[in-house]
Each structure stands twice: as structure tokens, then as C-alpha cells.
Amino acid sequence: MAALQEKKSCSQRMEEFQRYCWNPDTGQMLGRTLSRWVWISLYYVAFYVVMSGIFALCIYVLMRTIDPYTPDYQDQLKSPGVTLRPDVYGEKGLDISYNVSDSTTWAGLAHTLHRFLAGYSPAAQEGSINCTSEKYFFQESFLAPNHTKFSCKFTADMLQNCSGRPDPTFGFAEGKPCFIIKMNRIVKFLPGNSTAPRVDCAFLDQPRDGPPLQVEYFPANGTYSLHYFPYYGKKAQPHYSNPLVAAKLLNVPRNRDVVIVCKILAEHVSFDNPHDPYEGKVEFKLKIQK
């Protein structure tokens, strides 16, 4: 018992550790001979090669089952969201206020529209084609260059008086501002059976002492042509541009906060979702001072 309980000195422990690292009598290093180290290394190399191969095969099979032309993440909403340009947000949503006689208050709004419509210049639309059918543009095959599908052109000049060319101020200087309404994209979404979706803007609460909101729409009737639908995704249609509708508000009361709602009227577009205020419509507060 005394021998078992005898404590080893530091030099003895160092000597044992050195013999464990390299034992000249047996030719072992760290408890194994060189040949055993070679065999165990080959075993682990083969093991991890096989495991990596199985993992790569699983990833390959998984990727083969995924359609590259279908987005990985899609919203559960059946109707597209609607956005507004210019978009100035306040504490409770879109809030736009400016003074007709002070250009510094609306110059930024006009600049926002110019910058947004730069993507709708003829040069930016060179990869798209002219469409005039006014019917759904179904494409089963990839006939466009680079195994893609064709996209229909939409240029800023289609917005006519709200394109920024005849009036670079977009009507802000005269108190008849232009606002651009855009529907978000949904892959393979069809807004209706045969009728083009239409934008309708009105006061949310009609002022008692004034007429209904008068709006001039561009393109005519405020419609999104059907040949821009369906959308097949960014990979299939890399040159696709959302169609736009511009609403020129003609009789907004001065020096008063008004709330305007622009709805998309179409058979397959709903705008009464209490949980999403931008589904199928967009609301914004507007105040024009003079």
C-alpha cells in the first residue's frame, strides 16, 4: 500500500511523458507505431470522404427537386401589395405635406419621382419588347435570349403628363400633384379573367363642404394592361418592369389634412384586409399649403 501511495517526483512524471511521446524501445509515438498511425489516418480520411460524398449527393438531389424559376419565399397573401411614389413616411404611415409657393418643400418629392422613373427610360427598357395585345401574355417556353422569357416594355412616357417631361415638377408647383401607384409582383398572378385591373383614388372621408376627388389617370382609365401578366419571376424575366399608373390629383383642398386611398379594382385583388393596410390599396395623408 505504501508503494502504491508513493508520490512520483516531477522528473519521473516528465520522463514518463517523454516515453509516451516517443518510446525508443517499441518505436511508438503517442502510444502507436508509425504503421498504426498510417492505417488510422487512412481510415479517417476514407470515412470523411464517404461522408462528404453522401452529403454532396443529398444536396444535389435536393437541388434537383427545387424549381429554380420559383421563388424560395413567397407571401401567403393572395393579393399584391401596393406602393406609392413619392413615399414619405410619418409616424402613422405615408404623410406628404408641402407648400406650393415654397419650392424647397416639394423639390425633393419631384426629385424622388425623377429618380424612380429613371428605371423606365427607353435605354433601361432595351431588353424588353413592345406589347399591344392587351391580353395575358402566357409563355410556356423560354424563347427569349439566355433561356429567359420576354418582358413587355413600360416606359415613363406612357405616364404622359405625369412622366416628368412636359412638367418637370410633376404638378407639385401648381398644387395638382402626380402620384405613382405600383403593384408588387406575385409570380403567376392573374388579376382577373379578362378585365384589366384599374386604380381608383378617392378621399377616405369625403369633406362635407367640397366635391369628390377629381383625378386624371395615366395611362388612360388608370389601368394596368393585361399583357404585363403573368409575371414568371426574376430568373425567368430579368428585364421585367412593373407597370405603373399615375394619378394626378386636381382638386385637393388647401391648408387641410386629407387622407386619400387608392385601390386596385380587379376580380382577384382584395383591399379589405384589416391586418395589412397595403394589400390591394395604399392610403396616404396629404396636405397642400399655399
Curated annotation (Swiss-Prot):
Could you give a GO molecular-function term held by this entry? ATPase activator activity
- Name where it mostly resides: membrane
Question: What does the record say about tissue specificity?
Answer: Stomach.
What GO cellular component is one of the record's annotations? Answer: sodium:potassium-exchanging ATPase complex
Recorded hits in NCBIfam families, A to Z, give: Na_K_ATPase_bet
What PANTHER family does UniProt report for this protein, alphabetically?
POTASSIUM-TRANSPORTING ATPASE SUBUNIT BETA (PTHR11523:SF11), SODIUM/POTASSIUM-DEPENDENT ATPASE BETA SUBUNIT (PTHR11523)
The entry's protein name is Potassium-transporting ATPase subunit beta
